[in-house]
Amino acid sequence: MIEEVSRNEMLSTIHYMTEHFPYRLAGSPCEAAASRYVTERLKQYGLEVENKEFYTYNSDPMYSKVTVLEPEMEIDSLPCAHIRATKPEGEIFELIYVGNGDYAAYKDIDVTGKMVLVEVSYAPPVPEKARIAYEMGAAGIMCMNWGNDEEVICRRGLKGVWGNPTEANFHCIPEIVGVGVTRGAGLKLKQLCLEGRKVEVKVTAIADRTWSIVHQPTAILHGNGSSDEFLLVCSHLDAWKPGVTCNATGNATTLEICRI
């Protein structure tokens, strides 16, 4: 089977998806078009195919701006998904560094009404950092990227609930402002905080939270019926722009397995 894998076929799929469907935000027209493309490809391979639709609690992070008031400087940022949006003119927060953002990081620190600066290179996962921050009284969270000091910002979601929320856990979604910044910018702010200086930031972060229809292409290749065992292959279709390694590569791999 490995000998039948076509590098050119997979690269063609990756290029097509990233050129035609670069920002596959769940529930968006781009995501819907990508789902139709995948569905048609699966049909061509002779599988039993269905492009399912279902409602999900969704979020579109639209815009953010972060200005450090003292010392004055503007830093690049991206808004997180599933946040409490700020006022259009922005809101001012005192910034407090809390390391990895777990419960122990808040010992003897009062973050009530403030924005916490967290590092995301280790546990707990970012949505849990946001949930803990909100539980501790924080009004906002700023996530510095992990890795080298490159000018890269990751898109992040702070929903704090896996899958669709229910009546039982809807309250677990933190009502908190959230933005992501580069590691370089985060390290500068971290140093200011560790020096004992009062760091104030003006943050504008705009994102919505709404129920919307999303798509899930599924396909079945039936066996000969001699066994109840099955093989499940999956890859998420939705993606932040440009959506190459997350996850056009995964989609191309899934389609190539189906082709073979």
For the regions a protein language model found, what residue spans apply to each?
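A conserved hydrophobic secondary-structure block that centers on an alpha-helix together
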Residues: 100-153
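Solvent-exposed loop/turn segments at secondary-structure junctions
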Residues: 23-24, 44, 55-58, 102-103, ...
